C-alpha cells in the first residue's frame, strides 16, 4: 500500500497569504490569481498516474493528507470549496480514499486547516456544509455525479 499527500498547488492550498500566494483555483479563476499548470487537469493527471502505476498493479493508494486552508475572503473560499470537492471526487474516480488534514486552527490564513473543534467535535469555520460535500464527493456511487458535474459548478 502507498500513501501520498496532496496540496497542489501549495500557493493556493497552504500559503495564500505569502507574496506568491494565490486566491483562486481552476478553469474559472481570474488571470494572475491562480497557479498556472495546477488546475483541474493537473489533479486528473496526477491521480491518473497514481492509478496506472499502483492501483492497476494491485497496490492500494490512499491520500493520507490533503486540504486547503480557510482563505480570508468569501470569493477565495468559493474556490476553496470547489477545489476540495473536485479533489475528493477525482480521488473517488481514481479509487483513492482521502484523509482530510485538520490542525484545529480557526479563522483564515496560512496553515488555517480547522474543520472540527478537537475538544467537542463541533464544526468550526462554518465548515459543516463543506465537510458534507467532501464526504459526498469521496463516497457517492451516483453515476450522474462526475468530475464534469463538479467542473461545471466552478465559481464564476
Residues covered by each model-derived region:
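Extracellular glycoside hydrolase catalytic/binding regions
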Residues: 1-93
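Aromatic-rich peripheral "rim/lid" segments of glycoside hydrolase catalytic domains that contact
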Residues: 73-156
